[in-house]
């Protein structure tokens, strides 16, 4: 099986890479995704062992701040069933879940965060989905060449 690469976005005041670093075994479930295209990536394509870039959004500066790995493949997001959760989805049921999540484990925090501005300035990354107009997905695929360049920039 060919390893795939992904980028996930999180607002650091909601859940930061530092929060992940403090989590048990540096692992967490990636819940609350409520976009069908992102859900399909999680449910159908993200596989154990895939690489994940952790992106801090809605902050200054927006940056890729570290590397994670998928450690559990897509399974139903439990928050969709919890009426007290902000992610509650009343038309979903345990028998017919709509939303899915994966578990990720922190591999490392970058010494140098890779800022959105630096991504935009790098010719190797000019086609990266993250910087394409109108792309606001919280989960998106990353090409191997882009992955390698980001890893180099963050080291």
Indicate where each model-derived feature is located.
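Compositionally biased, charged N-terminal/linker segments
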Residues: 1-48, 146-147, 154-155
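Short, conserved beta-strand edge motifs with alternating hydrophobic and charged residues
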Residues: 7-9, 55, 67-69
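Short, charged beta-turn/beta-strand-edge "cap" motif at the junction between a beta-strand
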Residues: 55-62
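A short secondary-structure junction signal
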Residues: 18-20, 80-81, 115-117, 150-153
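Aromatic- and Lys/Arg-enriched surface recognition patch
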Residues: 66-137
């Amino acid at each position: 099986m060919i390893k795939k690469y992904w980028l996930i976005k999180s607002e650091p005041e909601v859940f930061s890479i530092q929060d992940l670093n403090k989590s048990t075994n540096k692992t967490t479930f990636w819940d609350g995704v409520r976009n069908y295209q992102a859900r399909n990536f999680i449910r159908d394509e993200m596989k154990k062992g895939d690489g994940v870039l952790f992106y801090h959004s809605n902050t200054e500066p927006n940056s890729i701040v570290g590397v994670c790995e998928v450690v559990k493949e897509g399974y139903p997001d439990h928050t969709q069933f919890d009426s007290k959760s902000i992610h509650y989805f009343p038309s979903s049921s345990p028998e017919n879940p709509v939303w899915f999540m994966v578990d990720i484990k922190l591999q490392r925090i970058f010494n140098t965060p890779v800022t959105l501005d630096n991504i935009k300035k790098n010719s190797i990354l000019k086609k990266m989905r993250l910087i394409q107009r109108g792309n606001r997905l919280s989960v998106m695929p990353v090409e191997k060449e882009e992955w390698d360049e980001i890893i180099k920039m963050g080291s």
